[in-house]
Amino acid sequence: MLAIHGWHWGTIVQNKLHRNINLIYGLAFFHSFMIIVPVIVPFFISKGLSLAEIFYLQAVYASTIVVLEAPSGYFADLFGRRTALLIGSVVHGIGYLCLNFADDLFSLIVFEIIVGISASLLSGADLALLYDTQKTLREEGTIDDGKGIAHLGFIKSSAEGLGALLGGALALWSFDILVVVQALAAWMCLILALGVVEPPYKKESQGVDHLGIGRILKHLLQGDPLLRKIVIAIPLYSLATFHVAWLMQPYWESQGISLSMFGVLWCSQSLVVALASKFGFEIERRHGAAYALT
């Protein structure tokens, strides 16, 4: 009887973990479904901001992410990835809700800080949950697919592309409606995060956890040169990507390109990234990570 009960309970857990994968994919989709990003510069200009103030806003956003990237990862390890997802999703929704009422530089700075906090909490938490979920299912012999990370990248980039098309169309109609739709998409992250379960993963004892951040920083700064370079490269790459993105939009506007075409152009580059994510896994599997990065 106990064996039957144990088998039944194990089946329930497996079903929840399998459902986890789809929920994480869905959450990643709506988190990346940023319909406002392809027209963010014209949107800020419509609020009366100069180009210098717009870049100041992006500096605030990028700085928030860089400062909180490591602490948010430690928070997720300490309190659980699901907790980080839930809090990040709530903050994400609040941020875009506040954007509906932001009309000056100060309120937009507050918005950038809020969404920067949410991006730090959500960044990596979905990936870690997906990895732990698939690792558990592989150990139990119920899944043998190692392409989950590649699929996650493909879904995120595809969401950016689809969001860009919708954002370009809505921007022609009304920025106010665009922001409302963006807020609704943001709150979808919380709805999906509520269904996610925490997969089992190795966690250090409570006594060690208090020393964990010091040991992690020491290992990062002194122990592993490759890891140190990766940690430095990731935020620098993100910052460079942000600034190129914000520079392109004023250039497009100066060339007389319509807002609807902003969405088409942004969608095109997002689809290229999606395809690279899709096939990058095979390149890495066959030739190694160093070759793929090169």
Feature names for model-found ranges:
Residues 7-18, 197-232:
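Juxtamembrane intracellular "pre-TM" segments in multi-pass secondary transporters
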Residues 14-67, 225-267:
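Helix-loop boundary and gating motifs at the non-cytosolic
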Residues 69-80, 171, 275-289:
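Helix-to-loop junctions at the C-terminal end of transmembrane segments
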Residues 90-103:
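C-terminal ends and interior cores of transmembrane alpha-helices
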Residues 113-157:
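Cytoplasmic helix-loop-helix junction between adjacent transmembrane helices
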Residues 160-181, 250-256, 282-283:
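Transmembrane alpha-helix termini and helix-breaking/packing motifs in multi-pass membrane transporters
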Residues 177-195:
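Symmetry-related core transmembrane helices of the 12-TM Major Facilitator Superfamily/SLC fold
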